[in-house]
């Protein structure tokens, strides 16, 4: 993000001073560039590639209506909106996906995640290890952990993360995918799937879901080029519920814990001339952190000054590097994302003319299991953030 004076992309001492006084003392893996190959059966002169990743051969543009639930709605317990921040999981900047939760299956795990619309599976990535179906139960069975990219058109994609066992028709075409490896349609043939057909088991008790439209670019990323090459889909993230008709749309929205618009959440908070939005530490270049794809903690140089993903009245400051604040002792639910005393001043009102502005970082409420409660301010002062 860029300020008029100076660029907000960088954490410059002249603009920002971070002072953290301690009271006591997981990520989405991005696609890596691969060589483009000619579409099967297509002459080179007519070959087209998608407009999000610039890698997958395709033939048509445009969105498609979602005619199938991606999972039985009666088995979905809740949907968390986009925009959550957690330095512990690598999401210092607001997440571009929703979190879909279910209960532990009663009996055999037989339900599959389904294609919401016609399209083709073009990329499946297997993470480095299998996971417990129920991470709270050490005797729970292990399930695979996949990230899957589903292309509906040259401009329209659905992405699922943390899916389980692949559907038989899909696994037959991919073969065994080793840990830490990927199946790519560029090196094979895209797997065509019709709306309502199975893709994979749900996986654990929560997975990630996002939809991206190359013809839509979020206005709240004032320098969209900073995401190119690392997470190019991010600036094209859209509300997935808009593609469903009733009654399915309302069925899904009834599971969403955010009750204010936009119900699907918000991820783009950059406002030029203010401190609001995503920041990248000087020398880290952009979202990539100036490290190789797959390198650990690329988000160390990330900072976001935004708002609560469930309750946008809550100011939220998320910091990628180790601040010295002991979250385990003082704020177990913070994970590097802190509240602000009084939720003021509003970051959208703070700019170069504001001089030195003090934010008192606060804990968040750590009680019960409701996400909305954990988004509210706690009572412990954790440090001082000076802008």
Please place each PLM-identified region on the residue numbering.
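Acidic, glycine-rich flexible loop segments
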Residues: 365-387
């Amino acid at each position: 993000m860029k300020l008029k004076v100076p660029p907000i992309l960088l954490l410059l001492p002249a603009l920002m001073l971070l002072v953290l006084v301690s009271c006591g003392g997981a990520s989405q893996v991005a696609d890596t560039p691969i060589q483009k190959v000619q579409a099967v059966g297509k002459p080179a002169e007519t070959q087209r590639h998608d407009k999000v990743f610039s890698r997958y051969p395709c033939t048509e543009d445009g969105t498609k209506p979602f005619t199938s639930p991606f999972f039985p709605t009666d088995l979905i317990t809740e949907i968390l909106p986009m925009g959550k921040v957690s330095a512990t999981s690598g999401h210092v900047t607001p997440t571009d996906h929703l979190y879909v939760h279910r209960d532990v299956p009663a009996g055999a795990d037989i339900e599959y995640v389904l294609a919401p619309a016609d399209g083709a599976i073009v990329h499946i990535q297997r993470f480095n290890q299998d996971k417990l179906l129920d991470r709270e139960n050490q005797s729970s069975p292990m399930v695979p952990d996949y990230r899957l990219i589903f292309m509906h058109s040259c401009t329209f994609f659905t992405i699922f993360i943390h899916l389980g066992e692949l559907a038989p028709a899909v696994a037959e075409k991919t073969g065994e995918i080793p840990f830490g490896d990927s199946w790519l349609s560029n090196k094979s043939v895209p797997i065509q799937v019709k709306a309502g057909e199975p893709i994979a088991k749900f996986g654990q008790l929560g997975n990630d879901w996002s939809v991206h439209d190359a013809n839509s670019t979020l206005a709240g990323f004032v320098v969209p080029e900073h995401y190119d090459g690392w997470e190019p889909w991010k600036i094209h993230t859209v509300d997935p519920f808009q593609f469903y008709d009733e009654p399915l749309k309302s069925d899904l929205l009834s599971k969403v814990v955010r009750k204010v618009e936009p119900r699907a959440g918000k991820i783009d908070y950059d406002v030029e001339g203010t401190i609001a939005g995503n920041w990248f530490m000087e020398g880290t270049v952009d979202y990539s952190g100036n490290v190789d794809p797959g390198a650990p903690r690329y988000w160390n140089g990330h900072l976001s000054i935004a708002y609560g993903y469930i309750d946008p009245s809550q100011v939220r400051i998320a910091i990628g590097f180790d601040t010295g604040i002991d979250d385990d002792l003082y704020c177990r639910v913070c994970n590097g994302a802190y509240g602000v005393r009084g939720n003021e001043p509003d970051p959208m009102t703070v700019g170069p003319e504001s001089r030195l502005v003090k934010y008192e970082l606060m804990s968040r409420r750590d009680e019960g299991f409701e996400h909305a409660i954990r988004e509210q301010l706690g009572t412990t002062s954790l440090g001082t953030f000076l802008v």
